[in-house]
């Protein structure tokens, strides 16, 4: 008997100028939760990445509604991932001709939803 693969929808955003460590802290809060509950949690978080993740999650929900005609109440966050993107390297000048490197990190955020 063939098992059916669960219907999944996803959304991703690339080259976000936020450190992946900061984004992962928020993504860990919404993993495994229903989409509606995750949206509510993100709406009231005071952190900068939470607004980006909120918009991305809304996009994933609307992708699921458009592609599979599913209600937002039956969706859950299957996977929430923040991968490291390219690092922008800058130089901060200091005294006596020295210069210290600054790494401006970027990340790629991916959210996958599945039906409960």
UniProtKB/Swiss-Prot annotation:
Any one Pfam family match given in the protein's UniProt record, by short name: Ribosomal_L22
Subcellular location: Plastid, Chloroplast
One MF term in the entry's GO annotations: structural constituent of ribosome
Cited InterPro entries: Ribosomal_uL22 (IPR001063), Ribosomal_uL22_bac/chlpt-type (IPR005727), Ribosomal_uL22_bac/org-type (IPR047867), Ribosomal_uL22_CS (IPR018260), Ribosomal_uL22_sf (IPR036394)
GO term, biological process aspect, one: translation
Signal peptide: none
NCBIfam families in the record: rplV_bact
Family assignment from sequence similarity: Belongs to the universal ribosomal protein uL22 family.
Subunit structure: Part of the 50S ribosomal subunit.
Function according to Swiss-Prot or TrEMBL: This protein binds specifically to 23S rRNA. The globular domain of the protein is located near the polypeptide exit tunnel on the outside of the subunit, while an extended beta-hairpin is found that lines the wall of the exit tunnel in the center of the 70S ribosome.
Record-given protein name: Large ribosomal subunit protein uL22c
Organism (species): Euglena gracilis
